[in-house]
């Protein structure tokens, strides 16, 4: 089973082809695995993992015992999977390689559409084609907006909660029971995940996700935040640099700081000529400090622990970011104890 990220020159993939071993894309494999369920597919540029987890939680609380497959780990699940025995399945489906077309769901949610892997116009066309083939309820966040109270912070999460609530009620869940279920939602790993009262970790990696994360923490901590962020790839940074610069220049307050790490290098044939330096040059004076690696980021944060009300690590791909958040939380807790 392979993803689109696996290049044709990958040694394991080449050996599989040489030996005649069948190779299947992960989307096709998951679609087959869920073919016996009434599938609800959750698509969109931002918020898919959170909405998938919210919907799974609501359906479970309403007695449907769904089978769920998410793009992120969920507390209380078996990692990213909830192995329910009911007839309904909920799955996050991926637009980054347009592999969502491998799925044939009964119902669907589209959270939103923005320029990320493709232009907004191309993303809209992909999502329009996807939902056109859905026979059951469709909740499309591009056209229908609302908010519902939910246990996790941020206006974006209240909007996510509304989409999950709408689809759950369309499937027959009692509206009030579904609303109450959102108040006991336990969150998703790496989605403003708290490591103590002053440290958070988030998966944010595009302008929309970073804006949601930053504004949520800024509202909670008006005295200032420090965010450690690593761009997750050279191609995404090249595509989003101008939008990232505009977003950071809009949200970073005088009392805030962005600690900018080098681009995460996952190998392969990427064009590495544009890096974090290019983004840093476009940010307003004093907004950004560049650091060489996670150790340097940790040392900088420790030296400035009293300068900010809260710290956050964020970015995709780099497995070391949650560990940095945990270490920072430990340092701050030790200092608080004296």
What are these regions (language model features)?
Residues 4-137, 142-146, 165-168:
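Phosphate-binding loop of NTP-binding sites
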Residues 1-3, 91-92, 110, 227, ...:
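Redox-cofactor binding/interface segments in oxidoreductases and associated redox assembly factors
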Residues 149-155:
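A short glycine-threonine-serine/GTX helix/turn-capping micro-motif
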Residues 53, 128, 154, 163-338:
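ATP-dependent carboxylate-amine ligase
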Residues 47, 157, 206:
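Nucleotide-sugar-dependent glycosyltransferase donor-binding/catalytic pocket residues
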Residues 29-33, 144-148, 266-267, 294-299:
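A short acidic, often aromatic-flanked loop/helix-cap motif at beta-alpha or helix-coil junctions
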């Amino acid at each position: 089973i392979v993803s689109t990220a696996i290049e044709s020159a990958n040694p394991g993939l080449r050996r599989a082809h040489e030996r005649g071993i069948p190779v299947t894309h992960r989307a096709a494999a998951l679609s087959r695995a869920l073919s016996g369920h009434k599938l609800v597919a959750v698509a969109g540029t931002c918020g898919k993992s959170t909405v998938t987890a919210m919907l799974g939680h609501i359906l479970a609380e309403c007695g449907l015992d769904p089978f769920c497959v998410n793009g992120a780990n969920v507390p209380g699940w078996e990692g990213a999977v909830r192995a329910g025995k009911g007839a309904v399945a909920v799955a996050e489906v991926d637009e980054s390689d347009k592999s969502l077309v491998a799925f044939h769901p009964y119902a669907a949610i589209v959270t939103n559409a923005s320029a990320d892997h493709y232009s907004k116009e191309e993303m809209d066309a992909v999502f329009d084609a996807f939902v056109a083939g859905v026979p059951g309820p469709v909740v499309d966040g591009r056209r229908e907006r609302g908010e519902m109270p939910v246990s996790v912070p941020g206006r974006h999460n209240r909007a996510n909660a509304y989409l999950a609530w709408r689809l759950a009620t369309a499937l027959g869940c009692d509206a009030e029971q579904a609303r109450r279920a959102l108040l006991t939602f336990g969150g998703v790993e790496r989605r403003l995940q708290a490591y103590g009262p002053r440290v958070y970790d988030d998966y944010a990696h595009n302008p929309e996700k970073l804006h949601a994360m930053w504004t949520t923490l800024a509202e909670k901590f008006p005295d200032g935040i420090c965010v450690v962020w690593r761009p997750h790839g050279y191609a995404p940074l090249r595509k989003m640099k101008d939008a990232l610069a505009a977003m950071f220049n809009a949200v970073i307050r005088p009392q805030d700081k962005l600690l900018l790490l080098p681009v995460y290098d996952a190998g392969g044939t990427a064009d590495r000529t544009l890096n974090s330096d290019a983004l840093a040059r476009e940010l307003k004076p004093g907004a950004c400090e560049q650091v060489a690696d996670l150790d340097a980021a940790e040392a900088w944060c420790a030296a400035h622990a009293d300068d900010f009300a809260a710290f956050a690590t964020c970015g995709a791909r780099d497995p070391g970011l949650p560990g940095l958040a945990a270490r920072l939380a430990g340092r701050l807790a030790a200092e608080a104890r004296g």
